[in-house]
């Protein structure tokens, strides 16, 4: 049951990221990096930014 809730939250967050990035793209069409930056911020663990993940 928890997995379903987690997936629902994840879908909501991803939808919000899409909306925010779309709004940012409208405001600043020359700044392509913003949407990719947002996706990285939301979907990668913090250690991925520093490159300290141990797999």
UniProtKB/Swiss-Prot annotation:
Residues 16-41, 54-55 form a propeptide. One of its GO terms (biological process) is defense response. Disulfide bonds join 47-53. Residues 1-15 form the signal peptide. Expressed by the skin glands. Keywords: Amphibian defense peptide, Disulfide bond, Secreted, Signal. The keyword Transmembrane does not apply. The keyword Secreted applies. Its main location: secreted. This is Riparin-1.5 acid.
């Amino acid at each position: 049951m928890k997995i379903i809730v987690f997936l629902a939250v994840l879908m909501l967050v991803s939808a919000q990221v899409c909306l925010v990035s779309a709004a940012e793209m409208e405001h600043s069409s020359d700044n392509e990096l913003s949407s990719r930056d947002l996706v990285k911020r939301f979907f990668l663990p913090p250690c991925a930014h520093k490159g300290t993940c141990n797999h």
